[in-house]
Amino acid sequence: MFDFIIDFETMGSGEKAAVIDLAVIAFDPNPEVVETFDELVSRGIKIKFDLKSQKGHRLFTKSTIEWWKNQSPEARKNIAPSDEDVSTIDGIAKFNDYINAHNIDPWKSQGWCRGMSFDFPILVDLIRDIQRLNGVSENELDTFKLEPCKFWNQRDIRTRIEALLLVRDMTTCPLPKGTLDGFVAHDSIHDCAKDILMMKYALRYAMGLEDAPSEEECDPLSLPTKR
């Protein structure tokens, strides 16, 4: 049985935000199984959404648009239209296909994201959109059977890392130098792989399976940022 992690990149901050892409990676939660950054990225998928078709239906907020203008060129290129762009309806269908193909048990698997008020509410609202398209009335919308894992198995990455490292507000975990070679911040699939590794290493440090690296041996890309 695998767990999974999701990350949306968006044009807003609420559950109705326009979605740029959705990344998902299924992973083995066993702390003795530590895969490389590249191995995790290669197992995952990134679903790129058509932004134009979301105008008038989902929210594009001015502050988020301005925020994207200040990100790296590598991150901003993910916003540009591409031949791989799909509708939100088709994108969620691709997401469901991936979940079903990777040994995810909706009753036992844990689903992870960085902040419980962001990714899962967006995912649930996109599932509701599918129900609306199928003619389900607003007072009958019910996503319980359609979510990839039950709500009580949805977990927050920040809380996990903070609890394992026993330091308030420490929501990133120092990783050995070279662990994140090739990482691009705000590339959703890279963010997912990074967070899997942070949770794994935080657990390994807590269990005494491995010592945390010294400051000199720490990967600088794993050190705290503004977010």
UniProtKB/Swiss-Prot annotation:
GO MF: single-stranded DNA 3'-5' DNA exonuclease activity
Keyword Aminoacyl-tRNA synthetase: no
Keywords recorded for this protein, A-Z: Exonuclease, Hydrolase, Nuclease
Reported function: 3'-5' exonuclease that preferentially uses ssDNA as substrate. Plays a role in group I intron homing. May play a role in the final step of host DNA degradation, by scavenging DNA into mononucleotides.
Annotated protein name in UniProt: Exodeoxyribonuclease
Organism: Enterobacteria phage T4 (Bacteriophage T4)
Domain of life: Viruses
Taxonomy of the source species: Viruses, Duplodnaviria, Heunggongvirae, Uroviricota, Caudoviricetes
Pfam families according to UniProt: Rv2179c-like (PF16473)
Catalyzed reactions per annotation: Exonucleolytic cleavage in the 3'- to 5'-direction to yield nucleoside 5'-phosphates
Coiled-coil region(s): none
E.C. designation(s): 3.1.11.1
Listed InterPro entries: RNaseH-like_sf, Rv2179c-like
Enzyme class: hydrolase
